[in-house]
Amino acid sequence: MSTTVKILLLNGPNLNLLGRREPGHYGHQTLATIVSELSTQAQQASVSLEHLQSNAEHELIDAIHATDAQFIIINPAAFTHTSVALRDALLGVAIPFIEVHLSNVHAREPFRQHSYFSDKALGVICGLGAQGYKFALQAALSHLSDKQLQS
């Protein structure tokens, strides 16, 4: 894959607290460690990975509007259950995306089991901890490679 391929990684509210926030649900790895490992994985595939974590919905929306990425990996965190605006931003740019969650949202409280994104996502990965991000990146690379072959 050429170096012009770009993937945008977005992480929503409270994910800056990974490693110390409810490690029973979210694991012990920090977001910085996860992003570093993903950056290495992307670099090995000759792909550019841009990352933004924000607790502010509008910053995530602005990043989606401004991106020239060919793929988005998003962990909307608590916005999963509340943000029609973030959903509309993703639909508005028509960039394929994968939704990632560290915990198994389906095994948690009922309010966490609804997503405004999953019906529009290329795929959803949940419950696999930090490993889920790596699987999402692999799936994104595979999707982009398949798309390139079809062109």
From Swiss-Prot:
Transition state stabilizer, annotated site positions: 21
E.C. number(s) listed in UniProt: 4.2.1.10
Pathway: Metabolic intermediate biosynthesis; chorismate biosynthesis; chorismate from D-erythrose 4-phosphate and phosphoenolpyruvate: step 3/7
Residues where substrate binds: 75, 81, 88, 102-103, 112
Xref: InterPro entries: DHquinase_II (IPR001874), DHquinase_II_CS (IPR018509), DHquinase_II_sf (IPR036441)
Domain of life: Bacteria
Active site location: 26 (proton acceptor), 101 (proton donor)
Family to which the UniProt record says this protein belongs: Belongs to the type-II 3-dehydroquinase family.
Name of the protein described by the UniProt record: 3-dehydroquinate dehydratase
Lineage, highest ranks first: Bacteria, Pseudomonadati, Pseudomonadota, Gammaproteobacteria, Alteromonadales
